Amino acid sequence: MSLSDKELFELNKKAVTEGFKIKPRINYNTVGGVNGPLVILDNVKFPRYNEIVNLTLPDGSVRQGQVLEVRGTKAIVQVFEGTSGIDVKKTRVEFTGENLKIPVSEDMLGRIFDGSGRPIDKGPKIFAEDYLDINGSPINPYARIYPEEMISTGVSAIDTMNSIARGQKIPIFSASGLPHNEIAAQICRQAGLVRPTKDVHDGHEENFSIVFAAMGVNLETSRFFKQDFEENGSLERTTLFLNLANDPTIERIITPRLALTTAEFLAYQTERHVLTILTDMSSYADALREVSAAREEVPGRRGYPGYMYTDLSTIYERAGRVEGRNGSITQVPILTMPNDDITHPIPDLTGYITEGQIFIDRQLHNRGIYPPINVLPSLSRLMKSAIGEGMTRKDHGDVSNQLYAKYAIGKDAAAMKAVVGEEALSTEDKLSLEFLEKFEKNFISQGAYENRSIFESLDLAWSLLRIYPKELLNRISPKILEELYGRDREQDDDEDEDEEDPDKSGDKLIDA
């Protein structure tokens, strides 16, 4: 039986390529133009969306890009390292046939990388345990576990009143000139689990890791983070990704995805509890706007693309816990609100996706209070599942509610005092003013290197609430009030007596 030429060709092709997984790649010299961070390619065959492209420049240097759009035989590629120096006639382009992947390993802990995932700490390259797609894999909603157990940050205003659950995503809303970098560094230094519960098999400190990604930061901020982590020893459990302000803007689009892919490997394959901090998401959104403008897309609010909500969700929704895995990813993105405007599209859309917010206040900062966290507009929607008996303390929820109520009343009393004067205030209003002053001075304010446990913060909260008579503490259950209010009052009296008479020694009651 004779075979046709076509059949013979197919048999020869199969014999030659059998056992080979690598397909031949085609190089193109068909760069049609350059527009901002984008390169337009002509006459290319079968380009794929999100495919990685290698561009070889005339000087021999190689840059990576990603296919953003395909129109027939044309492809639009965003170049991560920028398009300066790309010669339209002499640049060669190679399609790899793969999505962008990052080599991951436990050895990434203690290392510093640039915004594209290359080591910049003079250490060796990562010996990869696996190569993972930076876009991640969608998690089956049915496989997700509700976030529980509290992560302690050592900051009273966060731990007591806006507790963060393991697996939660909660942003920090800041503004230009406010100390969000210092707060982020403090959280990295001090973060850890409060106490392991029955499903946390391994709660020791080595099992808690941090992935930190900075986008568009200046050299001074970059040096601050590197030096701070190295000096206090937290670098050993931290992986840093640093995209500087003078790095290509387009690189900021992949930096948070590299960080989250690393976090997913540490959480779901090595079963660690990972805290992921992303700063500054406003720089990321600006990079998104730049690409959108270069593609001449119809702009949305303030010039940002209409798909920014969807794009942000592909980052924020990669936090959480998964059934059958002990690890978790808790996300704390930080964003600066342009002109302190909370209605700006970036904080507005972020607030829809995430589970609360921590609000950094300029007025508190101007009065010298650090950290300047305004607890009234702050919120943690999953706090109820992270606190209480067995996780923190049984009085945690009631104390938090009472602090919120009394702080709001104190703010109203301060506004009234500005109008009618202190003489016209009632006794309760004067107590509220005293509470307001001590709450901001002693509770919210703390040192940058002061690490308060949740139990110390709750004890401090009780000492402030004792300014009021028991009858005015109406947000705390009578049972808890009866158990803790009187005993704390006696302890305070003992401490006052000891201050008056240093030689006097007596037994002190231990706080619950």
From Swiss-Prot:
Gene3D superfamilies: 3.40.50.12240
Alphabetical list of Pfam families matching this protein: ATP-synt_ab, ATP-synt_ab_N, ATP-synt_VA_C
Residues the record marks as site: Required for activity: 378
Keyword Electron transport: no
InterPro entries noted in UniProt: ATP-synt_VA_C, ATPase_a/bsu_AS, ATPase_F1/V1/A1_a/bsu_N, ATPase_F1/V1/A1_a/bsu_nucl-bd, ATPase_V1-cplx_bsu, P-loop_NTPase, V-ATPase_su_B/beta
Keyword Nucleotide-binding: yes
Single GO MF annotation: ATP binding
GO CC annotations on file: plasma membrane; vacuolar proton-transporting V-type ATPase, V1 domain
Residue segments, region Disordered: 484-512
Observed effect of gene inactivation: Results in the inability to grow at alcaline pH and altered resistance to calcium, osmotic stress, cold temperature, antifungal drugs and growth on non-fermentable carbon sources. Leads also to unability to fully assemble the V-ATPase at the vacuolar membrane and impairs its proton transport and ATPase activities. Finally, leads to autophagy defect and avirulence in a Caenorhabditis elegans infection model.
Membrane disposition: Peripheral membrane protein
Extent of Basic and acidic residues compositional bias: 503-512
Compositional bias (Acidic residues): 491-502
SUPFAM superfamilies, A to Z: P-loop containing nucleoside triphosphate hydrolases
Compartmental location: Vacuole membrane
Keywords associated with the record: ATP-binding, Autophagy, Hydrogen ion transport, Ion transport, Membrane, Nucleotide-binding, Transport, Vacuole, Virulence
General function of this protein: Non-catalytic subunit of the V1 complex of vacuolar(H+)-ATPase (V-ATPase), a multisubunit enzyme composed of a peripheral complex (V1) that hydrolyzes ATP and a membrane integral complex (V0) that translocates protons. Plays an important role in resistance to several stresses, as well as in autophagy and virulence.
PANTHER family, A to Z: V-TYPE PROTON ATPASE SUBUNIT B (PTHR43389:SF4)
Cross-referenced HAMAP family: ATP_synth_B_arch (MF_00310)
Description of how the protein assembles with itself and partners: V-ATPase is a heteromultimeric enzyme composed of a peripheral catalytic V1 complex (components A to H) attached to an integral membrane V0 proton pore complex (components: a, c, c', c'', d, e, f and VOA1).
UniProt similarity note: Belongs to the ATPase alpha/beta chains family.
Protein name according to UniProt: V-type proton ATPase subunit B
Gene transcribed to yield this protein: VMA2
